[in-house]
Amino acid sequence: MKIKFLQAGNGDSFLISFNDGKQNRNILIDGGTSETYYSQNANTQGDLKTELDYLKDSGETIDLLILTHIDNDHICGLLKWFELDDKAYEMVKNVWFNSGKLIATYLNEPEIEDLRVGLKIFSDTKTGVHEAIDFEDYLIDKDIWNKKIIIQGQKIEECGIKIQILSPSEEQLIRLLKEYKDKTGDSAYTAGKGKDWHKNIKDFIEEENKSDFKFSQDRSVKNGSSISFIMTFKDKHFLFLGDSHPKGVIKQLKALGYNKDNPLEVNLMKVSHHGSKANTNKELLKIVKTENYFISTDSSGHNHPNKRTLARIINANPKAIFHFNYEHVRNDIFNPQDRQDFYIKARITKELDF
């Protein structure tokens, strides 16, 4: 199995490729910002378009497209692909997408207009006139979405792999519908505020080891609705956390029998919410055992990752290997004192083979 970590701005986009014993398979998790596919201002194509063009030329498809949640830094690259490529749907065989309408139907609640995702496609390629439609209507019309809710506790087999869903819970979906209208945009709930990179790792660890330190969890209802999961291929396990909240993930891991004495062992953990300090806590790091921690962001927008998060990881696992997809983040977040105090392994990783 090969996992490619696409440069997705301050967002997420991962391409997983493997052979199921019969044919090559591809799973795409999120699409990053719109520039991940194509930047109209710079007239340059991003990693997502490069990878999709390669698959298309090779006669391969996206067997499963997972949209973890509807934040711009996860969905806009996908929307740009469907907007600019009128044959994009032909490459996609199946989609996981908890749309606002689907969640409302599942919960038998009124739909929230603010949760709709719009899509503009060329209705006439000669005139360049765009037609505005709902993204979910497009997916239904092209018959690539079965409208199945993806929710905590499900165990799904796709293309020779097993996926254990950790979030969202039904409670988190209810919160999304009931609270989102008052928090449209969610900027106050997701922003990383100023960078904390000036502070030493050692200082963070000493501060958090004090008995009176309290963890403050992310309050974004959109992030809480993220599809997070354990992916298993043969004897390899991978943890993809989207922008999920740690408490809900921990609760589900415990329900599956994992704890600090019987941790979930994975080959890779995609750190939640681009390394935000509000999405990874000590308890989660005790329940999940791995060497490889991947953080996807260029640090624009919300100033992620928080160095405090990396300090928590180092405190829990001094042998941690950090994987970044932007060199300036890898180079700037650790200072000389950090490297003197700890043996830090930080890499720029475009892909990993397992």
PLM segments and residue spans:
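C-terminal regulatory/interaction regions
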Residues: 1-3, 8-12, 247, 252-263, ...
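Flexible, acidic/histidine-containing loops and adjacent segments that form or flank the divalent-metal
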Residues: 85-237, 320, 325-326, 336-354
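Conserved beta-strand hairpin/beta-sheet module of binuclear metal-dependent hydrolase folds
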Residues: 1-57, 221-247
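C-terminal functional module detector
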Residues: 167, 173, 200, 211-215, ...
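Active-site catalytic pocket residues across diverse enzymes, especially alpha/beta-hydrolases
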Residues: 18-20, 56, 82-86, 253-257, ...
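Active-site metal-binding motif and surrounding structural segment of the metallo-beta-lactamase
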Residues: 43-96, 259-278, 287-291
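Active-site environment of divalent metal-dependent phosphoester hydrolases
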Residues: 10-12, 33-36, 70-75, 102-104, ...
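Long, well-ordered mid-to-C-terminal structural blocks that present hydrophobic/aromatic surfaces
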Residues: 225, 229-279
